[in-house]
Regions:
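Signature for HUH/AEP ssDNA processing cores
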Residues: 1-150, 157-163, 231-237
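DNA replication initiation modules
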Residues: 5-9, 13, 94-117, 158-238
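Short Gly/Ser/Thr- and Asp/Glu-enriched loop/turn motifs at secondary-structure junctions
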Residues: 145-152, 185-190
Length: 238
């Protein structure tokens, strides 16, 4: 089981099937994400026109998009958190690396792509010409388009033999032929939620119940100690 944070000022809460679908299906979620994409498209159009006097409008649109994004709830797939006290003394499952309990899930960001759906078509093989079959073959449990409309989140099962979270990302990225966002190495990293219609694949049977105790036992203390760098020097990288 993983968790989510309603906003930066709230402790995390665990996610089950009902909570997940309520979050991604909420009209509020769709309204925010639609607003983000409208503003990003506006900024892209202005920048493409390359009119110097209008670039300030592009910056303003991007700033508005960023503010809307910060209003979205966010999933934390990689971990849940022990109850601790906030800086103001409030108890809760605050999103702290030092309070990490790894779930055995890994989340990988694929950023700056023109057409996310086309990217997933590149993952298919002759043996697995269907996205669902390919995801099941690789242990992928969830794929969705990010709020920007130009990225993908890929949630998959960690393999202890592949190393820690970022090691696992590099190995999966090599299999899919994509680049890894190195910023996504921490166990406490948030993933802003998506609209229901942006989910390209989901394995509901495992996503909400999966855990890898072996992985957690090996790496919990490592992440609690603030260490999230790659551990395997032979990790496959493009």
């Amino acid at each position: 089981m993983f968790c989510y944070q309603q906003n930066f000022f709230n402790p995390t809460k665990e996610v089950d099937r009902n909570v997940f679908w309520a979050l991604v299906g909420a009209p509020y979620t769709k309204e925010l994400i639609d607003g983000i994409r409208i503003r990003k498209e506006k900024a892209a159009t202005i920048m493409a026109a390359n009119v110097e006097e209008e670039q300030i409008l592009a910056s303003a649109a991007l700033g508005e998009a960023d503010q809307l994004k910060k209003k979205l709830p966010a999933f934390i797939f990689q971990a849940t958190f022990d109850v601790t006290k906030s800086k103001k003394g409030y108890e809760g499952a605050w999103r702290k690396q030092a309070a990490t309990r790894l779930t055995g899930l890994v989340v990988m960001d694929i950023d700056h792509v023109d057409n996310p759906v086309d990217v997933t078509r590149g993952w298919l093989t002759d043996d697995c010409p269907c996205l669902g079959d390919r995801c099941r073959e690789l242990g992928i449990l969830l794929v969705y388009v990010t709020p920007s409309g130009h990225g993908l989140k890929v949630v998959f099962k960690a393999r202890t033999e592949w190393g820690n979270l970022i090691d696992n990302q590099h190995r999966m990225a090599a299999l899919l032929g994509v680049e890894v966002d190195e910023a996504c190495k921490d166990a406490s990293r948030m993933s802003f939620i998506c609209r229901k219609e942006d989910i390209l694949f989901i394995n509901e049977q495992e996503l909400f119940s999966y855990e890898n105790k072996e992985f957690a036992e090996k790496y919990n203390d490592v992440y609690r100690g603030g260490h999230s760098q790659p551990t395997l020097f032979d990790t496959v990288r493009r």
